[in-house]
Amino acid sequence: GSGCHSLTLQEAGKEVHAIDISPLSVEVMKQRGVRSVSQTNLFNEQFADEYDTILMLMNGSGIIGKLENLPDFFRKMKLLLRPGGCVLMDSSNLSYLFEEEDGSIVINLAGDYYGEVDFQMQYKNVKGDSFDWLYIDFQTLSIYAAENGFKAELVKEGTHYDYLAKLSRQA
């Protein structure tokens, strides 16, 4: 990202370590004044520090990619979180995209999860590789969290099918 959340937390006196897989994003964060930045993938085995809070904002669930990656995500969070730590993650429920005129929602239950999206970035004539991105509804997130030793709490519901969740390890 651009580091806006990291900068706000830094200015509030918090110790912050930002990561991104994009070398350009890492460079932007450094130029903007984020003091501790690494170019890495959250799922990289070498990324193994411990944290009190892990912020995954701006549809932060996206980097998980697919529902099938959620167990790996929760395993990684168990390694990264200090005792009593939490993940603050936001996402959106894309079910509204499948809403009919009568208000019903028509989703192919035999197909892929409706929140699994294939993204490809483009700026002018430069196209990046496509990548998986996960938008997950809170109920599904809660189920996967419980199955993997975490509790999901709804912190705030947004105005357009979006929400902020807190994920904590269950005792």
What is each PLM-predicted segment?
Residues 2-14:
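Conserved SAM-binding loop of SAM-dependent methyltransferases across substrates and taxa
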Residues 26-28:
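Short alpha-helix immediately C-terminal to the canonical SAM-binding loop
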Residues 43-54:
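A short acidic, Gly/Pro-enriched loop at the edge of an enzyme's catalytic core
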Residues 83-142:
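SAM-dependent methyltransferase
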